[in-house]
């Protein structure tokens, strides 16, 4: 598993590597990259055979690098990579990511994803069923994995 951490404040249990070392990461090992430069994000397409966690995924999508991230999303299956785009809100998930999403792991949320209505698969089911049920659950850490 390779975790891309925008600020180094999370994932401190993992060793830190440089972006040019990702091809050396063995499938049974985990590591993190901290705050890669926008020009380095394209290097993530060299990662193979593992899980790629994009923590605070909004950080990686700016106009300068969107094509690099898109290439990463498009080629993920050919490179045997599962991508986990982590966000603190549905509204923080860039629209591009929804196109490639197969599942949503949803915890309690306070935001209203109305502006993403056209982007989120199964929007009606999500807003009418899953969000209310999850938010009303007594366990603060309750979550649901929703196939998209």
Write out the residue ranges for each language-model feature.
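Short, surface-exposed beta-edge/turn micro-motifs
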Residues: 1, 29-30, 49, 139-141
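Walker A/P-loop NTP-binding active-site region of P-loop NTPases
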Residues: 1-27
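Conserved P-loop NTPase motor cores
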Residues: 3-10, 36-126
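Short, solvent-exposed coil/turn linker segments
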Residues: 18-21, 89, 147
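Short glycine-rich substrate-engagement loop in P-loop NTPases that contacts/grips substrate
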Residues: 19-46
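A general structural signal for short secondary-structure junctions and capping/turn motifs
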Residues: 25, 96-98, 133-137
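Ordered hydrophobic segments in well-structured contexts
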Residues: 32, 104-106, 141-146
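Phosphate-binding and hydrolysis-coupling loops of NTP-dependent motor/remodeling domains
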Residues: 115-148
């Amino acid at each position: 598993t390779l975790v891309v951490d925008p600020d180094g404040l999370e994932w401190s249990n993992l060793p830190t590597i440089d972006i040019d070392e990702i091809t050396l990461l063995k499938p049974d090992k985990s590591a993190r990259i901290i705050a890669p430069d926008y020009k380095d994000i394209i290097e993530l397409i060299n990662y193979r055979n593992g899980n790629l966690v994009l923590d605070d995924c909004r950080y990686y999508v700016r106009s300068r690098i969107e094509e690099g991230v898109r290439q990463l999303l498009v080629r993920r299956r050919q490179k045997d990579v599962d991508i986990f785009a982590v966000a603190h809100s549905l509204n923080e998930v860039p629209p591009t990511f929804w196109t490639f999403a197969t599942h949503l792991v949803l915890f309690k949320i306070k935001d209203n994803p109305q502006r993403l209505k056209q982007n989120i698969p199964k929007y009606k089911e999500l807003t009418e069923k899953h969000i209310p049920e999850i938010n009303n659950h007594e366990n603060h850490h309750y979550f649901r994995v929703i196939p998209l």
